[in-house]
């Protein structure tokens, strides 16, 4: 928060927001949600240049400064979805119906279903088809106040198609208001042509795939699905070591279905996040706490798969591990496009508080992506700001199926 100083004047402001209640989510502000009531916020060149109680607002040119009254409603940071698989082709709706009719996942996979069907459809799609489908999904997130989204590859599973997915994600960043961060997830699943040769496939991921991804500047991070049905601890470590050589940060799909110690491994590499983590144990939590690795909860997948093993929320709180929440938007296990719904699910399914939930899609989601310029409202931060028609920030987690977004600014521009 910046207060007025004698002779200080706000000059050349692009926009001044007044009469606001602001949930800054800034841990330096002691109030719950980092709240500043009866506040104002000034934007210049896409960043916040002043924020504080309106009574302390410095003088400014009333006639030259565009001003908007928030009328006592609430401002929060723009929401951040830090884990998605948003670029893909095809649908798994028929498979969903089969599962509910009693057909096992193994039977579906034997028929060419499961992730194999998504890989086949994604390989067959061109850049434009993938772009159009993903843009529509991004528009849905944008309408709910989302300003930054992470997009993973992982449905190509060969060099050309993994590159294609990441190229589409970069194009989306150029042509969509939402800011996109990309993650290379070549080690998502074993492609059919490598059946029984998982080490050979990891060779491909660590060498040809990663080399081309880096050469074309297509990834901001590297991820691995470390699981019994994915890749082993040793294979995951190989990918992380390859990423480290290229100075790319790592993250991990860890402990979703069993404890493979992926969270401990990603912490050893000072990784950004361990995601899913239903089977995370205390040693893993300790390692994450020491490394500053974020715990990313994915309640949509938990719900859709009807899982029963809860993430160790009490341990995460005990060791003060930052908790983020994401949609995990994907066609197989979390076909949903609503970060607001995830906030409610994190509270109802995992017993997070509404304040933890909002932190999970703002401040901690930014940390999970290695971003320090967003996720909180403070002087110097990006002016990614959501304006809500709510009476209290807990309402964002309490209600679902009701979108209370009124206005959204990304880098200070009204969307």
Swiss-Prot record:
Pfam families in the record: Amidohydro_1 (PF01979)
NCBIfam families: hutI
UniProt-annotated binding residues for 4-imidazolone-5-propanoate: 92, 155, 188, 256, 333
Family (UniProt): Belongs to the metallo-dependent hydrolases superfamily. HutI family.
Residues where Fe(3+) binds: 83, 85, 253, 328
Keyword list, A-Z: Cytoplasm, Histidine metabolism, Hydrolase, Iron, Metal-binding, Zinc
Chemical reaction(s) catalysed: 4-imidazolone-5-propanoate + H2O = N-formimidoyl-L-glutamate
Residue positions binding Zn(2+): 83, 85, 253, 328
Co-factor binding comment: Binds 1 zinc or iron ion per subunit.
Binding-site list for N-formimidoyl-L-glutamate: 155, 330, 332
GO molecular function, one term: iron ion binding
Designated name of the protein: Imidazolonepropionase
Record InterPro entries: Amidohydro-rel, HutI, Metal-dep_hydrolase_composite, Metal_Hydrolase
Cofactor(s) the protein requires to work: Zn(2+); Fe(3+)
Known EC number: 3.5.2.7
HAMAP family linked to this entry: HutI
PANTHER family in alphabetical order: IMIDAZOLONEPROPIONASE (PTHR42752), IMIDAZOLONEPROPIONASE-RELATED (PTHR42752:SF1)
One biological process term in Gene Ontology: L-histidine catabolic process to glutamate and formate
Species the sequence originates in: Pseudoalteromonas translucida (strain TAC 125)
Function description: Catalyzes the hydrolytic cleavage of the carbon-nitrogen bond in imidazolone-5-propanoate to yield N-formimidoyl-L-glutamate. It is the third step in the universal histidine degradation pathway.
Compartments where found: Cytoplasm
Record GO cellular component, one term: cytoplasm
Pathway recorded for this protein: Amino-acid degradation; L-histidine degradation into L-glutamate; N-formimidoyl-L-glutamate from L-histidine: step 3/3
Entries under Gene3D superfamilies matching the protein: Metal-dependent hydrolases, Urease, subunit C, domain 1
